[in-house]
Each structure stands twice: as C-alpha cells, then as structure tokens.
Curated annotation (Swiss-Prot):
GO molecular function: rRNA binding; structural constituent of ribosome
Family to which the UniProt record says this protein belongs: Belongs to the universal ribosomal protein uL6 family.
Cellular component terms (Gene Ontology): cytosolic large ribosomal subunit
Source superkingdom: Bacteria
Purpose: This protein binds to the 23S rRNA, and is important in its secondary structure. It is located near the subunit interface in the base of the L7/L12 stalk, and near the tRNA binding site of the peptidyltransferase center.
Keyword Ribosomal protein tagged: yes
Protein's recorded name: Large ribosomal subunit protein uL6
Subunit structure: Part of the 50S ribosomal subunit.
GO biological process: cytoplasmic translation
C-alpha cells in the first residue's frame, strides 16, 4: 500500500467530488477537472474525505497505482481550489517577452521572434518584460507549458543566460583560463 494513500484527501469548502462511469469529476471555485480511473483503483467519498484503495482483485501493482491516483486527485482538488503557478525569469541582454492575444512572443537572442500558442486552459502574464507567470488549474498542463518555455533557451552554465524557473539554482562553470607563461 502506498504510504501517501493511507491518508484521506480532505476536501476544502466549495470543492465537490463525484464519480460517474469510472471517471472522477472535481468541481471548485476555479473550475472543474476530470480524470479516468484505472481498474486497479477504487475511490470512496465519505464525509468530505476521499479515500483511494487498491481494487480487491489486483495483485500485481496496487501500491503504485494507488499512490499515483491519490496524487492526481489531490492535485485536482488543489487546482480547482487555489490553482497552480509557475514563474520563469529571462536573463540575458535583449531578452524580453510579451503576450499578444493567445500567443506568447519571446525575444531570446535568435534572429527571429519565437511565438508560442498559449493553451486555452492557461493564463500567461508578463511582468517587467522578463518575468513570465503561467497559471492554471491543471498542474500537469502548467508544468508542461512552463517547461516548453524554458526549453526554448535553457540557462547556460558559463554566464547563466537563458530562461529559468524563479529561484532555480543554475550550476556555474569556470571559463577557459587565460594563457600564462613565457615564450
């Protein structure tokens, strides 16, 4: 049994969970999310608490699936209640970002501007031209879009230029040592 899944998921005020046709639906103040349940998992709802158990017929991989679905449901509850946010910072001369409609426009030191379509479920905002904020209720979608932005220009280890998560530590390397010595 998964250690996390031993504890119930406590539902905050304003969040409702229902199960229909092997799908779990979580509704809250920020929206609603759906997830198809695996046959190895049984979900019970009692007194504003959600319990995730392994199905009685499963012998092969109950613990893994139980922990996975506990985490997925927990993230869905947190997403519809408070939401998720990833912040990225751009470091480099001339690096800037702008949101134009449903497109994120990045100037990241290449000969052409990089345009990225923003998924409809996310809100992207730019502060100070170099700080990008990605918000949404789906943790996976927020993380994937933030990672795709970062992948356009990952931070390099010599000067640290690039796009990084806020407060991300970038391990720096020493450059080439200057030539010294007599001829």
């Amino acid at each position: 049994m998964s250690r996390k899944a031993r504890d119930p998921i406590v539902l905050p005020q304003g969040v409702e969970v229902s199960i229909q046709n092997n799908e779990i639906l979580v509704k809250g103040p920020k929206g609603s999310l759906k997830q198809v349940l695996a046959p190895e998992v049984v979900v019970d709802i009692k007194d504003r608490e959600v319990f995730v158990h392994a199905a009685p017929h499963v012998v092969d991989r109950p613990s893994r699936m139980q922990g996975l679905f506990w985490a997925l449901i927990s993230n869905m509850v947190q997403g519809v209640n408070t939401g998720f946010e990833k912040r990225l910072e751009m470091i480099g001369v001339g690096f800037r970002a702008a949101v134009q409609g449903s497109v994120l426009d990045l100037s990241i030191g290449v000969s052409h501007p990089t345009k990225m379509p923003i998924p409809a479920e996310l809100q992207v905002s730019v502060e100070k031209n170099t700080l990008i904020s990605v918000k949404g209720i789906n943790k996976q979608l927020v993380g994937e879009f933030a990672a795709s932005i970062r992948a356009k220009r990952r931070p390099e280890p010599y000067k640290g230029k690039g796009i990084r998560y806020e407060n991300e530590y970038v391990r720096r390397k020493a450059g080439k040592a200057a030539k010294t010595g007599k001829k």
